[in-house]
Amino acid sequence: MPLLQELNTRYLGLHVPKEDSFWSSKMGLKSAAPGEFENHELALKAFISDQTWLPKLREALKRQDLTDAERIGLCGWLRFFEVNVVESDDAKRLQRELVEMEGELDRVRRKMKLGYTDPKSGEFMEASSGKLSLMTATHAEEAYRKAAWEGMRSIERYVLDHGYLPIVKKRNELGRLMGFEDYYDYKVNLFEGFSKRKLFEILDELERDTRASVQSAVDQVQREKGLSSGRASVVDAREPWNFGFLTSGDLTARRDPYFQFSSALGRWGASFNALGIRYHGATLKLDLVNRPGKYENGFMHGPQPSWIDGGKHHPARIGFTANAVLGSIGSGISALQTLFHEGGHAAHFSNIFMPSPCFGQEFAPTSVAFAETQSMFLDSLIGDSDWCARYARDEKGEPMPLEIMEEGVELGHRLAAFRIRSLLVVPYAEKAIYELKDSDLNAESILARVREAEKKLVPLTSSARPVLSVPHLLSGESSAYYHGYVLAQMAVHQTRAYFLEKFGSILDNPQVGDELAEKYWKPGNSKTFLELVQDLTGKPFSAAATVALVNRTL
């Protein structure tokens, strides 16, 4: 089928160099030329937004001599262009301007002199966001935890002063020009196929049903370890630099010997292999250690999608990153979580077997929520006591003590509501930002909306992770996106409940890997998030499993 072949070839000719330059840019490689990624991005956007493909595809689909594979491939491209086409010249202009503005903000942000002021010497100490996060969670002295948190929060004012405001305004202009309420509404429809209103009906229900649990959890920590405990030398558990340390800082330190960075890669490979997860000849490129100039959040990208061409499989080529801060407490478990998370993304995109690369790329119409379900389901395994009993070993090969595992399970349960509501902070804040009128769009109004969202979702004095320090908000690809993690967490609980009810155990069960590959991964984006979750679990997507878990008494 000439049209199908042309689309497959032209798309790969644009997608592959764009993703390769994306990697060079985000990794801070010397080979990355300023503006190179933006140029490739603009070329790809011009292709995917070209409305002239739609009548050609509709006409081709009328043919009676198409093979099943050809019809499926053409239908995939039709949906791809229906989602991505931009007919308005003004909208195309806005897209081009946004790519350039976002690229400049990214370059400026990565050059930011980030760090903390040493509370004893008064000296400014440079530190990455990864190191600051670890310090906030694990440093034994409150003054240093606070200094690290303040270092993270400094990102907020910095991005507001260096280009984020005009980007928000222009994004909203694009969203309205595309026929939506605002940019957030546009992005939700683009990736998930339903409206912002529908999304927040789901999230509002989750917020309501977890409200009492999170307040109870924070109050309990304050009673046991904070100001209400009656102990000497206590700190306020409700301060954002104290809550994480009081709930898990000591546990993180005691678990640390069993999660060495040097063992992370082997444990990821052994665990995924035992689950029956295969990468089908994919080439994986890993960049795992933190360094200056490197993008400060783990991610996966796929320069070469996995797809089938006339019966021949083209394996995926995938890169993913972690930001391990070697020698720091918690760096080993952080690296392992990233390997399971980003390696989960890689497993998903390596197992797509459809007759066009449009089914196996990670952008619209691929669902953000569904993609994150795969990675978050797999990184959830590390928190299971049976996984720890089998894989968590110290340097002498000794297993993690049972009491540490039990404490980890208890902590995970106690903080379940807090953790999912911490995720909720970002979409609620970002929604509020994009709902500001242009005349009200300034740094103070944005910060006020962010603080309102923090106060609504998490009963601390502020969010443990300052909202505008979350890099997703700055990038065009991941802005108005974070709700996908919340929907994914709900789908993870539903998926886990299904497997546990069916098999009794997930650990090292190859039947789990087989079902993931067949029901979740193979179809690519030929089905929606809601359809895929129901196909596997046999039940419509809902918050039921999440709410039941969060509110269950130990």
Predicted regions and their residues:
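Amphipathic, heptad-repeat-like alpha-helical segments
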Residues: V159-G163
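Post-HEXXH active-site segment of zinc metalloproteases
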Residues: D185, N189, S331-I333, Q337-L339, ...
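Alpha-helix capping and helix-loop boundary segments enriched in small/acidic/polar residues
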Residues: F194-R197, R255, F259, A324-S334, ...
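Active-site-proximal, well-structured secondary-structure segments within enzyme catalytic domains
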Residues: E123-K131, L165-N323, E398-G412, F418
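N-terminal helix-rich structural modules
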Residues: M1-Y158, A480
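Post-HExxH zinc-binding segment in Zn-dependent metallohydrolases
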Residues: L203-A212, A364-E403
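C-terminal, non-catalytic "cap/extension" segments appended to globular domains
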Residues: S31, I72, R79, F243-F245, ...
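Alpha-helical recognition segments enriched in aromatics with Gly/Pro capping
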Residues: L288-G293, Q304, G310-A316, Q337-T338, ...
